[in-house]
Structure formats: C-alpha cells, structure tokens
From Swiss-Prot:
InterPro entries: aa-tRNA-synth_I_CS (IPR001412), aa-tRNA-synth_Ic (IPR002305), Rossmann-like_a/b/a_fold (IPR014729), Trp-tRNA-ligase (IPR002306), Trp-tRNA-ligase_bac-type (IPR024109), Trp-tRNA_synthetase (IPR050203). Catalyzes the attachment of tryptophan to tRNA(Trp). A motif ('KMSKS' region) lies at residues 193-197. This is Tryptophan--tRNA ligase. SUPFAM superfamilies: Nucleotidylyl transferase (SSF52374). It comes from Halalkalibacterium halodurans (strain ATCC BAA-125 / DSM 18197 / FERM 7344 / JCM 9153 / C-125) (Bacillus halodurans).
Length: 330
C-alpha cells in the first residue's frame, strides 16, 4: 500500500521560484510513488487580514499553478481547505489537547506577534489547525522547509497525546526536509529565504514574472568581488545561491555548472542563468494561462474536495467517537 503525503501552501500571492524549486518540483515526483494530498490552506491565510477579492484570486491562481507545474489530478488530490469542513472541526479538537505554553513557544508565533499590540488568537492556534490538516488523511510523510519543522514536531506531539488519552486514531507523521532546494535564498540578501513577503520585488523571482523582469532581477542580484563562479556557502553565499538555482533548473550537478563557467565572469554566468530560469518557467506559465479561467480548473477542484471530504469525514468521526462527541449511533 502506498504511503500518504500531505502538503499545504497558503494562497498569499504569487509563488516564487524558491517555492517551485524547494517544494512544488519535488511534489511532481512524489505523486508517482505516494498517495498525495495537496491542499490550498485558505483558512491559514486568514490568520492575518486579507482582502476578500484578492484572497479569492490567490486561491484560484495557486490551484492553477499546482496543475501547471505538473500535479496530475488522476494521481494526486488537489483541494481547498475551507471546502472540507473537517479541517476546522478537527482543528478545534486539536486545540483542546494543546497547551497555551507550547503554542506560545512556537518561533513563528513569537516572530509574527513581536512588538504588536493586537495579535489575532488564530496566530496562536495556527499549529493545531495545521496538525488537523495533516492528521485527517493518515499522513505518513510531510515535506516541509526548515521553518515548519517545529510545527511538525508539535503535530506529532498532539497526535501521540490524543492517541494515548483517547484511542489510537491518528498516524504519526514523519518530517521530510528536501536536501537541495529546500531553501533558495533572496537575490539581494543571501542570508534570508527567498520570499514573496519581502517588500523589495528584486529580492525574488515570481513564477509568473515575464522574461524581461526575470533577466533584470538576475542581473541586479548581489554577488561578491572575486568574480569566480564557485560554490562556497560560507564565503560566497550569494553566488552559491545562484549556482543552486542554475543546478536545480537545469538538472545538472553544482560541479557541472562550475565547470561550465571556469574562466568566465559573473556577467556571462548571470546571462546564462536568466535564460535557464526563463526556459524553466515558460511552459509552466503557458499552462497556467490555459487553466486560470477554465471550467477544467473548477472541475478538478470539485473532484478534489469530494475525495478529500470522504477521507477526512471518516477520520473526524473516529476522533469524535473517541472523545465522546455527539450521539452514539448504531
């Protein structure tokens, strides 16, 4: 029997090249060997204020991007979190087995609430909902970046706590952090992760950026002064980041890319890198344009929600029975 993989991405604006190389590209190969659930976590997105129309647009755009990169609805389940009510229901039950202290210790909560007068309660209770997302599908593996590892450890703790107190309902998931590409860094500050939330658009490449924009951003990416195209994360973090992008887009090893640019400067390297990135994103963008306003996209999301609802409902009912919720039914 195939193992189950669950992954959720927030619909908070266009995804970056870092999201693609660090996560989505990996998802395409995962769907061949695993039972995959890819969830657009719109309920997580509203932990911070959202414009209603923009959120709807982002949800649809993210769904189209999932499919455009190669997620196949006949092999994987793609759905929207809020269209499966069991997520919020089990999320509440997970809150009931969580402790305030452990939620306050979450690094992301500390970072996002730091210095703010009014903090949404949902920012604190985000991890129990994330635990529910994962546990509903008897997930074995969760592919995440380093920044989500702490939340995953809490998910495991909550599942074990629930199983011990009530019944063995949940599968304890394993964390999987991809070796390469898990962290593509910012183009203008290699100490920070490439992120669409960075106020400087030159720091990231959006998956929907056109050729001219991509070329411009790569040309303006920071480097160092020695002019040698060599991978050295400690002493040459900026060039090492650009080499990682080249290697992942081209499907070549770092050593092969280094060999290609022996005796050549950063200008030539950046020119070639820009073309490699454009060639990687172009077919994705073409498929995205076909999907974004199509009925096909709605049909796929309807099918995904139906399948996810069937599986999630069964798990929820078992958990409710274990806790003594509702009425006993024959």
């Amino acid at each position: 029997m195939k193992k189950t993989v669950f992954s959720g991405i927030q619909p908070s604006g266009t995804l970056t090249l870092g999201n693609y190389l660090g996560a989505m590209k990996h998802f395409v190969s995962l769907q061949e060997d695993y039972n995959c659930y890819f969830c657009i976590v719109d309920q997580h997105a509203i932990t911070v204020p959202q414009d209603r129309l923009k959120l709807r647009e982002n949800i649809r755009s993210l769904a189209a991007l999932y499919l455009a990169v190669g997620i196949d609805p006949s092999k994987a389940t793609l759905f929207i979190q809020s269209e499966v009510p069991a997520h919020a229901q089990l999320g509440w039950m997970m809150q009931c087995v969580s402790y305030i202290g452990e939620l306050e210790r979450m690094t992301q909560f500390k970072d996002k609430s730091d210095g703010k007068e009014a903090v949404s309660a949902s920012l604190l209770t985000y991890p129990p909902l994330m635990a529910a997302d994962i546990l509903l599908y008897h997930t074995n593996i969760v592919p995440v970046g380093e920044d989500q590892k702490q939340h995953l450890e809490l998910t495991r703790d909550l599942a074990e706590r629930f199983n011990k107190k009530y019944n063995d309902i949940f599968t304890i998931p394993e964390v999987q952090i991809p070796k390469v590409g898990a962290r593509i860094m910012s183009l203008n500050d290699p100490s920070k992760k490439m992120s669409k939330s960075n106020p400087n658009p030159k720091s990231y490449i959006s998956m929907l950026d056109d050729e001219k924009t991509i070329t411009k951003k790569i040309k303006s990416a920071v480097t160092d002064s020695d002019g040698i195209v060599k991978f050295d994360k400690e002493n040459k973090p900026a060039i090492s980041n650009l080499l990682s992008i080249y290697s992942l887009c081209k499907g070549a090893s770092i050593e092969e890319v280094e060999a290609q640019f022996v005796g050549k400067g950063y200008g030539e390297f950046k020119e070639s890198l820009a073309q490699v990135v454009v060639d990687t994103l172009k077919p994705i963008q073409e498929r995205y344009e076909q999907l974004i306003q199509s009925e096909e996209l709605d049909h796929i999301l309807d099918q995904g929600a139906d399948k996810a609802n069937r599986v999630a409902r069964k798990t929820l009912e078992k958990a409710e029975r274990a806790m003594g919720l509702g009425r006993k039914r024959r």
